[in-house]
Amino acid sequence: MDRTEAMPHFMTHVVKPARVLALMRLEKDFQTHKNTLATNWTNDFQRICNQLGREQIRKNKPLLGHLTFSLLRTELAVGRAIYVVEATDSSWFFDRNPCQTEYDASWALRYLNQMKDEIDSGRKAYMRAITLPDVEQIVLREAVHFHQYVIQLARYALPTAIQSPEFAALSTEDVVEIRVGEYMDVSEVVYKIDRRVRDAQSVREWIDEGSEQEYAYEVFDRLDLSRGEYSEMDFRYSRFEHSDLSDARLNGCVLLGTRWNHSRLVRADFSYSLLFGANFDHSDLSGADFGGIQASKGLLEPDSWEMPGFWEISFAESNLSKASFIDAQLAEAQFRKANLAGVNFAGADLTNANFTDAHLREAVFVGASIASADFTGADIDGASFSVKDRDKLNLDERQQAAVLWIEAEREEAYLHELFYPVSR
């Protein structure tokens, strides 16, 4: 086999399997230890802020507008998983005097080294058609996949890390973007601060313009956006904290990683939206519609890798009374201490969902997938479950006696009426 034939064969039969194996290992590590990783990331972030703060004073630097973590391929080529961290003013790339320090991402890029070992071992079967320099070049190209986990961890950790006194001590603009990318190349916002006082009406008018790209990674905190029509829009990774979106229509939206903490969302319509990794903790969602949403934790396809998996959607300590989650995908969702009285979960995937200490009186679980769901301490008086799921539920004696068990015939009739209603 000559080199022309060998390289495509090598990429398909050695590199691709090694990539998938390494990324699946990294995915498992990230999902299992993400809270520990986030704590370590926050500690690094505090150290970075301290160093940048000293640099800012030494250089008599004006207000900072951007904090950018950039992968250095030159460092990667010599085995170091180093990102340069630059604090710049509002001019960003045009700031000729940035404050700089470093971030070590070995926790993620060590899996790239494992992949390198795998493909270096695999190249030997190709004799001299695949060389060590070929492997080095392939590894540098493959780094982009592992780099995505650095982006994902920053997104996960920053809502907490940003509260640190070390960051507060920096002198910053009213609008600050924290970004992760490659050096002098494409980067993306992982957290944005916007302290400007904005008028709700002007924000509504801006959204009404309907730009396809402008609403992702945005800040919509402390605004009255109630009764708005926002369906089929892309708000990925935006924040709506302490805001009012009661009676708003957000069905069919891209809402990945959005944050809605401490907001009023009464009767809001989120049906059929993508809500992977969203956070609704401490919010009022009574009567809200989450029917058909996609929000399960993990990879989009459990047996293949296309992008990093999402963390779980969370409704901890929220009011969801009379809300609807019919046919929603909610594997590993967090409902800890939430008010879920009268909620309809019919047909939903609630595998490994957490309902500890939740209020679930008269909630409907008929036709739902509830394997390994945790109901410890939950009040489930009058809640209805499919009788076929009795052995799958880990309920105490009081809970077992308090629920309604729906027989198969009644379940089938109920679900048929719910999903295939007949006009009368």
Predicted regions and their residues:
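Compact, glycine/acidic-enriched structural inserts
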Residues: 94-134
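Tandem repeat scaffolds
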Residues: 197-424
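Aromatic/basic-lined ligand-recognition segments
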Residues: 82-109, 203-204, 208-209, 213
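Short, flexible loop/turn elements at secondary-structure junctions
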Residues: 71-75, 89, 182-184
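Short N-terminal edge-element motif at the start of the domain
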Residues: 17-62
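A short acidic (Asp/Glu
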Residues: 78-87, 189-191
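Elongated alpha-helical scaffolds
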Residues: 62-83
